[in-house]
């Protein structure tokens, strides 16, 4: 056992890469340690042979957080880790995105990456360590891979500027949380959320990260120089030049003509007909070229045709130029019984978005390595197969749906009011009912509209736009509001969301090298132009949040009581508060400082609960008249209940101006009477009078 270890300084942290001690049977294995804060074991295994007939690259990335890493035992009956959490799924996608385009075209061997968090101090997110480890493990595995890749997280403060690899605590005070990954030459992936930063500030963060993670790339190269296995002897299949030429010669014009059909379904139908004709004419049964090879060549001609048209300035697939946003149709309040709803349609992409308000108890409970916490905002994205005119699996959310939902959430989250202003739990659901590109950005627009329709006091409306890029040699074209086909055939997917003042989310995935600062700057500027256009049209429908919540939403009443009254409201074993909730159908949340939030399905229910709480916490006021109930009669007077839990004594001498021989001559138990509070002594005992009520009323009490 001869482990190879490389250490390097990365910002304020010391990073250690170690291989050759753990998981030695994997193709590549690296243990990444950041100071004493995080340790992640990353393994890579590649299959030596590709599965026959597989038409895609079977790369899978699994990021997993073990509870023992934080000194915890899993909850639940089985006491072991179960299905991946949303955080694990999102981090798996984060690692996958920058490495996938660096495998050679045509490489179909299965590759599996497993990142296991084995130790954490809960100060920093382990995702950057996992990304560095993945790059290092691939670099030493011998698998064909055009790396290594570096990665970094960037925060931003107006006073101090950019901060490399911040802690959780530092992120709390930051206006930016951005993860950037790339090679020594180019940026490949950006994932971020921000608080209305400018386009220049966002671009500056990307370039700052790219400069800073060069030290990571150099360290991985040094590790690979000492520990890498021999590179696989893999050669791509030679390009089917003759087959491509035959298809282009006979069907090129027809394919080009098909891409002038602006309706997606009609275009797909025509391309399907052409593909069938090409296969029937050129495919050889049990020979070469096979039907699958002909179909692949047909797809390559499609790819080249669309790209050539775009970079040569011809109209796009649906007839637009490069800067035009598809026609918008915007409606709000489309579902009568929901709390807030919007139908956002952009061309052939449509999202039905619904906002629902709940109580603090409806917040999502998250059990993370950092500990349990409650999340009062949820945004869920659903992509049913009918949205693209297909039959398909229905079930739980997949990785793509979780990722798109998180992007939409990041986009609107910064514009939500704080819990001190709006203490409701918020759930937004985006149902994609039609899709032809940029459904996640349609979800952003729809979410902003639905939240304003629900009366959530948004700081500003938010819109999102997806940009694309086609680059051939020195020629390039940046596309505003890309279609699904343009996303698939293009070189970059660049999504920007924000308000009229600045960016709230930026996501970028690049499939090629050579994306320059100039191209990113132009794309951000073009995205701003489109975003302002969309916001202008949204504001014509609903420019600000409604003044009142929907009548269907729960009513919330906030109040505060003395802390020494909390136990009175709760009661022995919670009996009092439970009785109030059951009888009024409201829910009550009490904080240690005496703050109370009452949620009711109706205003009447919430008000009834408030009155009950007031009754319990109220103090008897000297000189005030109360309607009380006789609880107990004794020889010297009667005890009358005037407030919940508060009885006072009406002495026999205070019953009437006339002489009273027996209390029962005047009162009986259960009788309601008007009483005047005469005095409250220092022990809280209340002295009442019945005979002085008339005089008190006459004097205006």
UniProtKB/Swiss-Prot annotation:
Q: Name one GO biological process term.
A: RNA processing
SMART domains recorded: KH, S1
Annotated catalysed reactions: RNA(n+1) + phosphate = RNA(n) + a ribonucleoside 5'-diphosphate
Task: Please state the Enzyme Commission number of this protein.
Answer: 2.7.7.8
At the top level of its lineage, which domain of life is listed?
A: Bacteria
Entry-linked CDD domains: KH-I_PNPase, RNase_PH_PNPase_1, RNase_PH_PNPase_2, S1_PNPase
KH domain span: 554-613
User: Carries keyword Ribonucleoprotein?
Assistant: no
Domain S1 motif: from-to ranges: 623-691
Give the required cofactors. Mg(2+)
Q: Where does it sit, as one GO cellular component term?
A: cytosol
Binding-site positions, Mg(2+): 487, 493
Q: Which UniProt keywords apply?
A: Cytoplasm, Magnesium, Metal-binding, Nucleotidyltransferase, RNA-binding, Transferase
| Gene Ontology molecular function | 3'-5'-RNA exonuclease activity; magnesium ion binding; polyribonucleotide nucleotidyltransferase activity; RNA binding
Question: Which InterPro entries does the record match to this protein?
Answer: ExoRNase_PH_dom1 (IPR001247), ExoRNase_PH_dom2 (IPR015847), ExoRNase_PH_dom2_sf (IPR036345), KH_dom (IPR004087), KH_dom_type_1 (IPR004088), KH_dom_type_1_sf (IPR036612), NA-bd_OB-fold (IPR012340), PNPase (IPR012162)
Q: Name one Pfam family in it.
A: PNPase
Instruction: List the subcellular locations.
Output: Cytoplasm
* Function per UniProt: Involved in mRNA degradation. Catalyzes the phosphorolysis of single-stranded polyribonucleotides processively in the 3'- to 5'-direction.
NCBIfam families given in the database record:
polynuc_phos, PRK11824.1
Quaternary structure and interacting proteins, as annotated: Component of the RNA degradosome, which is a multiprotein complex involved in RNA processing and mRNA degradation.
Q: Which family does it belong to?
A: Belongs to the polyribonucleotide nucleotidyltransferase family.
Q: What is this protein called?
A: Polyribonucleotide nucleotidyltransferase
């Amino acid at each position: 056992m001869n482990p190879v270890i490389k250490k390097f300084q990365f910002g304020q942290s010391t990073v250690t890469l170690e291989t050759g001690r753990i998981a030695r049977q994997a193709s590549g294995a690296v243990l990444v340690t950041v100071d004493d804060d995080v340790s992640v074991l990353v393994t890579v295994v590649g299959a030596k042979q590709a599965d026959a007939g597989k038409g895609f690259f079977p790369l899978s990335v699994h990021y997993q957080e073990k509870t023992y890493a934080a000194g915890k035992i899993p909850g639940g009956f089985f006491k072991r880790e179960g299905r991946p959490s949303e955080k694990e799924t999102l981090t798996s996608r984060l690692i996958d995105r920058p490495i996938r385009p660096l495998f050679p075209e045509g490489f179909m061997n299965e590759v599996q990456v497993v990142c296991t968090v084995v130790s954490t101090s809960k100060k920093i997110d382990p995702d950057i360590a996992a990304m560095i480890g993945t790059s290092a493990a691939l670099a030493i595995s011998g698998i064909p891979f055009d790396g290594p890749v570096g990665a970094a997280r960037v925060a931003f403060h107006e006073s101090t500027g950019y901060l490399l690899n911040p802690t959780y605590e530092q992120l709390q005070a930051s206006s930016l949380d951005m993860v950037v990954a790339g090679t020594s030459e180019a940026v490949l992936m950006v994932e971020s959320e921000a608080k209305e930063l400018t386009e220049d500030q966002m671009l500056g963060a990307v370039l700052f990260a790219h400069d800073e993670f060069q030290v990571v790339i150099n360290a991985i190269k040094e590790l690979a120089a000492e520990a890498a296995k021999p590179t696989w002897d893999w050669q791509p299949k030679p390009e089917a030049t003759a087959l491509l030429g035959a298809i282009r010669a006979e069907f090129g014009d027809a394919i080009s003509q098909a891409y002038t059909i602006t309706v997606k379904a009609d275009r797909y139908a025509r391309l399907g007909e052409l593909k069938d004709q090409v296969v029937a004419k050129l495919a050889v049964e049990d020979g070469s070229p096979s039907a699958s090879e002909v179909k692949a060549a047909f797809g390559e001609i499609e790819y080249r045709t669309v790209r050539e048209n775009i970079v040569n300035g011809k109209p796009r697939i649906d007839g637009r130029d490069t800067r035009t946003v598809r026609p918008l149709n915007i409606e709000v309040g489309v579902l009568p019984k929901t709390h807030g709803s919007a139908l956002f349609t952009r061309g052939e992409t449509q999202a039905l978005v619904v906002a629902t308000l709940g109580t603090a108890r409806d917040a999502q409970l998250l059990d993370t390595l950092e500990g349990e916490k409650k999340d009062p905002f949820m945004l869920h994205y659903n992509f049913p197969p009918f949205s693209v005119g297909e039959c398909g699996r229905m079930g739980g959310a997949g990785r793509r749906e979780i990722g798109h939902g998180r992007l939409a959430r990041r986009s609107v989250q910064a514009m939500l009011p704080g819990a001190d202003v709006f203490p409701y739990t918020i759930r937004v659901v985006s149902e994609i009912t039609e899709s032809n590109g940029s459904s996640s950005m349609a979800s952003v627009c729809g979410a902003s509209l639905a939240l304003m329709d629900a009366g959530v006091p948004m700081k500003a409306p938010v819109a999102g736009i997806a940009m694309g890029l086609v680059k051939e040699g020195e020629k390039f074209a940046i596309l505003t509001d890309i279609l699904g086909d343009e996303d698939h055939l293009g070189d970059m997917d660049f999504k920007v969301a924000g308000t009229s003042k600045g960016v709230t989310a930026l996501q970028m995935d690049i499939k090629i090298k050579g994306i320059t600062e100039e191209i990113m700057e132009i794309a951000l500027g073009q995205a701003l132009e489109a975003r302002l256009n969309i916001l202008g049209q949204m504001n014509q429908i609903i420019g600000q949040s409604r003044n009142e919540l929907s009548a269907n939403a729960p009513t919330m009443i906030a109040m505060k009581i003395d802390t020494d009254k909390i136990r009175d409201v709760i009661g022995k074993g919670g009996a009092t508060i439970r009785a109030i909730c059951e009888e009024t159908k409201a829910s009550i949340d009490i904080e240690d400082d005496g703050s109370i939030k009452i949620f009711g399905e109706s205003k009447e229910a919430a008000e009834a609960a408030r009155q009950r709480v007031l009754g319990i916490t109220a103090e008897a006021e000297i000189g005030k008249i109360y309607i009380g109930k006789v609880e107990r009669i004794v020889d010297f007077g009667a005890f009358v209940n005037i407030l919940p839990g508060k009885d006072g004594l009406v002495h026999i001498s205070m019953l009437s101006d006339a002489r009273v021989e027996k209390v029962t001559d005047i009162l009986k138990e259960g009788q309601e009477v008007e009483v005047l509070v005469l005095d409250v002594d220092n022990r809280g005992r209340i002295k009442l009078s019945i005979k002085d009520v008339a005089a008190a009323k006459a004097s205006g009490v």
